[in-house]
Amino acid sequence: MTDDSNKTTHFGFETVPEGEKAGRVQGVFSSVASKYDIMNDVMSVGIHRLWKEAMMDWLAPRAGQKLLDVAGGTGDISFRFLKRAGYGHATVLDLTESMLVEGRKRAEAAAMADQLDWVTGDAMALPFADNTFDVYTISFGIRNVTRPQEALNEAFRVLRPGGRLMVLEFSQLPNPAMQKAYDLYSFNVIPRMGQAIAGDRDSYQYLVESIRKFPDQDTFLKMVRDAGFENAKFRNLSMGIACLHSGWKL
């Protein structure tokens, strides 16, 4: 484990000790858990659903596969994966227990509880043996990890040979004018939505800031390769507002 006692990282635009970030991220998602899915729809005007479908299209789930859905929260990616696969099993891991509670409710309502496990844990120190899973996904979560490279290294470790990594995350628009317009929307509208719908402006201010601090597409692609993944590629979604990164453990 890396010694984080004297190191700093970012929490949105704020510089904080590495040892504090996980707890502060946990506080954000504990605060918004019950409204998280609704806010995703409102903030993206439903477009996040199209991005997740694009993720499933590229991933092409197969029957019998074992999925690890990290930062899986309320289970949205896992449910989509299992429905596409026909049958299989998903383990949803998240740092925030209250997000998993919401996911369990969804699983029970959908009569899918027997296909899912829910685990509280850290993406940088996964509580699983080497070579356990066929697929690893993390959707809108890796930018909240204190050391994303360590999370990618852990993804490589727990995937079986032939296993696949798929990351869906907000990214950077290549056109500066479009990025400026998107920033105006993000910083002026999304925190206000957070206050109106979830009663929490600060958490959504953090989420907007965290997007701007995340590496661009090419930088993150190098991180995927540095973790050991091969055939690593990315696909922009909505002109780069979001991006999919894929890699294989061969």
Swiss-Prot record:
It catalyses: a 2-demethylmenaquinol + S-adenosyl-L-methionine = a menaquinol + S-adenosyl-L-homocysteine + H(+); a 2-methoxy-6-(all-trans-polyprenyl)benzene-1,4-diol + S-adenosyl-L-methionine = a 5-methoxy-2-methyl-3-(all-trans-polyprenyl)benzene-1,4-diol + S-adenosyl-L-homocysteine + H(+). It holds the Pfam family Ubie_methyltran. InterPro entries: SAM-dependent_MTases_sf (IPR029063), UbiE/COQ5_MeTrFase (IPR004033), UbiE/COQ5_MeTrFase_CS (IPR023576). Pathway: Quinol/quinone metabolism; menaquinone biosynthesis; menaquinol from 1,4-dihydroxy-2-naphthoate: step 2/2; Cofactor biosynthesis; ubiquinone biosynthesis. Gene3D superfamilies: Vaccinia Virus protein VP39 (3.40.50.150). It is an enzyme of class 2 (transferase). Its EC number is 2.1.1.163, 2.1.1.201. Methyltransferase required for the conversion of demethylmenaquinol (DMKH2) to menaquinol (MKH2) and the conversion of 2-polyprenyl-6-methoxy-1,4-benzoquinol (DDMQH2) to 2-polyprenyl-3-methyl-6-methoxy-1,4-benzoquinol (DMQH2). HAMAP family: MenG_UbiE_methyltr. Keywords: Menaquinone biosynthesis, Methyltransferase, S-adenosyl-L-methionine, Transferase, Ubiquinone biosynthesis. This is Ubiquinone/menaquinone biosynthesis C-methyltransferase UbiE. GO terms for molecular function: 2-methoxy-6-polyprenyl-1,4-benzoquinol methyltransferase activity; demethylmenaquinone methyltransferase activity. It comes from the Bacteria. GO terms for biological process: aerobic respiration; menaquinone biosynthetic process; methylation. It comes from Roseobacter denitrificans (strain ATCC 33942 / OCh 114).
